[in-house]
Amino acid sequence: FKTGHSLIKARMKETHSPLGGEMSGHIFFKERWFGFDDGTYAGCRLLEILSRSADPSAVLNALPTSHSTPELNVTCAEGEPHRLTTELQALAAGTFAAPAQINTIDGLRVDWPDGFGLIRASNTTPVLVLRFEGHTPEALARIEAAMLALLHRVKPDAQVGSAAH
């Protein structure tokens, strides 16, 4: 589904999810809160959940490890991000073979067994937003290179920079 706090909250309501979040670190709770995200509250709720376990370290150690980029941006002209996203989506099927799985719900997301790449148009500014994740540093490097190669096919002058948050 698409990113953005209002869209995440709507999806949580639709699916009756008690918890939702984004890679940006925004975490939303359905119960015992006012529906907006708050880092301190999220941390306290995590501690509450961990306190119910006889071995909190085991709970955390059971979580998958991954390597990811920060949010990356490509500055574009007004209206360009959506056009570029459409072009990327059209090229993806001929570029990425199985076991890659292509998702075009919100930009272009390509999932591999060992990670994913995402390029999407920002909903608020004229930029492309990029995120890459791999189970290992090598997987991350391979996925990032593959996605950037595709991006440079539709925008050869793309300069990737870290998001200014």
Language-model regions, residue ranges each:
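Phosphate-binding and adjacent anionic-ligand microenvironments
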Residues: 1-131, 136-165
